[in-house]
């Protein structure tokens, strides 16, 4: 671990409500620490809120000597006793102070050369939060979340993100909580439902506030706390991204950290989280604020006309898309293809190694039998399914199936790699994200399927079954409903998605149409392969999109999910005898499936 100066750490346990903790910070903590800095006894300080062993403040003071630290601890302990306490099953005492060494999360903030800048940002974040809390309305009630949203917008703006980039970044940050296991969180469905209800009620006001803030940051007329935070972020990011070393050539001042754009965005997501923490925003509130801010940034509808899911005007999004994505005869230059961009990997912690997945051979069954046997399965799905069976399903449907030689006009030969389904430009941008629930020989988890190497790439833990069921009403209906699909004992759930970011770079607006076609081709191939293996399922094209992308770890704009495909073995084939192929709800929307 690397840091600058000598930091002294105090853990002050304050078993109090958030508002009382705010008041204590303003009345007792900040004046004392600022006085130490003003007297030259410390060169800076910051704090965070924490819950381990009981609610407490972690206070870090730089270059504070032992005597000064002891006096500070004693004064804060006495002052804390006067703050109202709330009962709780914690092993700490209200007002207790512990001296605990400060151990920075160096890698999380960009490495040793970037850490000094991170620590300065912690101090700037502390000052901004205290200033916002000291305002006449403070952060009481919903005002706290309004301040948080403003600071989220200000962070993205200061990093040079336009509205689309900012929305993507904020959504990624909110979705990242899906992989956190150390903190108890609300189910994703609860957070998304709250975001959607607030957005529906306040869409216009939220959009106006965000636009006004961005304009104010551009002209220097924004409110003081978002403005000061944006200035601090802009200056710090310039140092983090700069390639020149510090004045002594060591980078000790944080200059020359040379962080890439992707790593910088990842680092600033951590800084945004700590800003919310200091403000007293809970993780679930943080998820909601970031999602709400992101949705606001993508708003383009007329403020006076509420959005409709069934628009009839010429301005309807689907009408405009179909018109603008056409290949126009005589105007080939407008739709000329572009070179394919290289695939990008998301910055972040090192991933676990890929998991090799063997594949059993396909059984020798007649095509007519497979075609006749492929139909959507209602009722409970179950195993058994083992690793070789899963490999057979995935790689016989997804992976390379053959090669051929193509002689070109100049006489050279090009080798074409084939898979069992067609793909625009042979880019194979239809992909599969996999939830392994109960498959022998494969650890439960969330995986990305890598057909090129016939491996599973670990993405994270598998979500709780109840959260998977919340993705579609087909999965959450009572077992007595004839259209219920039971996944309590299902071995796997597949998510078929498109790498639209890659496809769009080559085909522009045509890419979405091509992606929809390819994911349909792949899904049918998966279903036929499943039928040959004695498996069945229902491809669900209607699901709760934002929640599904979050649970599967997909970027909803660059990696749009097209189908959820729970697979397993039918419990009793006879139960299907009376099911109509066009049963209730066979259309789209969260209640729509496919037959």
Located regions from the model:
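"Short basic amphipathic alpha-helical interaction patches in structured regions
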Residues: 73-76, 408, 510
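N-terminal accessory segments that position/regulate proteins before the catalytic core
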Residues: 248, 256, 264-506, 519, ...
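Short pre-catalytic strand/loop immediately N-terminal to key active-site residues, enriched for Gly-Thr
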Residues: 509-518
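Gly/Thr-rich phosphate-binding loop signature of adenosyl cofactor/nucleotide-binding cores
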Residues: 522
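Structured binding elements
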Residues: 534
């Amino acid at each position: 671990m690397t840091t600058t100066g000598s930091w002294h750490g105090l853990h002050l346990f304050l078993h109090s409500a958030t508002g009382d903790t705010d008041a204590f910070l303003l009345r007792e903590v900040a004046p004392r620490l600022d006085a130490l800095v003003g007297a030259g006894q410390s060169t800076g300080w910051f704090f965070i809120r924490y819950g381990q062993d009981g609610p407490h403040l972690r206070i870090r003071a730089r270059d504070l000597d032992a005597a000064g630290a002891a006096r500070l601890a004693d004064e804060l302990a006495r002052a804390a006793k006067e703050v109202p306490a709330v009962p709780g099953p914690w092993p700490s005492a209200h007002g207790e102070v512990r001296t605990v060494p400060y151990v920075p999360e160096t890698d999380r903030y960009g490495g040793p050369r970037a850490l000094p800048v991170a620590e300065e940002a912690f101090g700037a974040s502390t000052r901004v939060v205290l200033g916002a809390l000291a305002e006449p309305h403070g952060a009481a009630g919903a005002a706290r979340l309004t301040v948080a949203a403003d600071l989220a917008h200000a962070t993205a703006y200061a990093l040079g993100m336009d509205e689309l980039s900012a929305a993507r970044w904020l959504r990624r940050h909110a979705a990242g909580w899906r992989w956190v296991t150390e903190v108890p969180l609300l189910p994703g469905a609860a957070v998304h439902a709250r975001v959607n209800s607030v957005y529906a009620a306040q869409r216009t006001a939220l959009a106006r506030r965000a636009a006004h803030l961005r304009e104010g940051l551009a002209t220097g007329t924004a409110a003081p706390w978002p403005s000061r935070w944006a200035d601090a972020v802009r200056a710090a990011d310039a140092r983090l991204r700069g390639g020149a070393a510090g004045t002594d050539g060591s980078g000790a001042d944080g200059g020359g950290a040379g962080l890439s754009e992707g790593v910088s965005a990842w680092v600033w997501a951590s800084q945004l989280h700590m800003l919310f923490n200091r403000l007293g925003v809970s993780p679930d509130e943080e998820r909601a604020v970031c999602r709400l801010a992101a949705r606001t940034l993508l708003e383009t509808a007329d403020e006076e006309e509420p959005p409709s899911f069934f628009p009839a005007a010429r301005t309807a999004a689907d009408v405009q898309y179909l018109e603008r994505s056409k290949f126009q005869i005589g105007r080939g230059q407008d739709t000329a293809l572009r070179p394919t961009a290289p695939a990008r990997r998301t910055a972040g912690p090192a991933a676990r190694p890929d998991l090799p997945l063997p594949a059993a051979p396909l059984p020798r069954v007649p095509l007519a039998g497979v075609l006749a046997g492929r139909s959507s399965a209602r009722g409970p799905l179950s195993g058994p399914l083992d690793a070789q069976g899963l490999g057979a399903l995935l790689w016989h449907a997804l992976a390379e199936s053959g090669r051929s030689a193509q002689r070109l006009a100049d006489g050279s030969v090009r080798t074409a790699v084939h898979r069992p389904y067609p793909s625009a430009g042979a880019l194979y941008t239809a992909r599969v994200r996999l939830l392994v629930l109960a498959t022998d020989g494969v650890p439960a988890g969330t995986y990305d399927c890598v057909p090129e190497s016939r491996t599973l790439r670990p993405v994270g833990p598998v979500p709780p079954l109840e959260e998977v069921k919340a993705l579609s009403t087909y999965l959450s209906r009572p077992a007595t409903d004839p259209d219920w699909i039971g996944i309590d004992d299902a071995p796997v759930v597949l998510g078929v998605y498109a790498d639209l970011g890659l496809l769009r770079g080559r085909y522009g607006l045509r890419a979405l149409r091509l992606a929809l076609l390819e994911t349909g081709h792949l899904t049918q191939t998966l279903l036929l392969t499943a039928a040959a293996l004695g498996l069945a399922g229902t491809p669900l094209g209607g699901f709760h999109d934002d929640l599904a992308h979050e649970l599967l770890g997909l970027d909803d704009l660059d990696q749009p999910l097209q189908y959820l495909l729970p697979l397993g073995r039918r419990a009793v084939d006879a139960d299907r005898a009376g099911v109509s192929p066009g049963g209730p709800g066979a259309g789209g929307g969260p209640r729509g499936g496919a037959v």
